[in-house]
Amino acid sequence: MKKIIYYYQTLIDLEEFIKNNRATHIILSSIHFGFNNNELYIHLNDSPIDSDIFNKVWKQLKVLNDNGLTIMVMMGGAGLAYNVFFDNYEKAYKLLTDFITNHEYIKGIDLD
């Protein structure tokens, strides 16, 4: 079976994609880890994952998953992202697994 994977980093409206989808997978990019007031946090591109700017993204990805697509996230490796992750592994791993668990339609992770 052929797989068509759509890498989704520029957060555009997915409504047209929902209507006319030919993909089998969507990989949302990119998850990173950083610090705010010395507190480790997880962010998608430049914003915390719980930011209101992602409300529509989460809803649309759930619809796509309900329509049979496999939804994954990519953890970005650019800009020394893995250094923060591995230097703070226990906290970062918990943030990552909590994020995936709380978004039940996310089925896996692509390690860039």
Predicted features and spans:
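Chitinase-like catalytic core of GlcNAc-active glycosidases
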Residues: 1-112
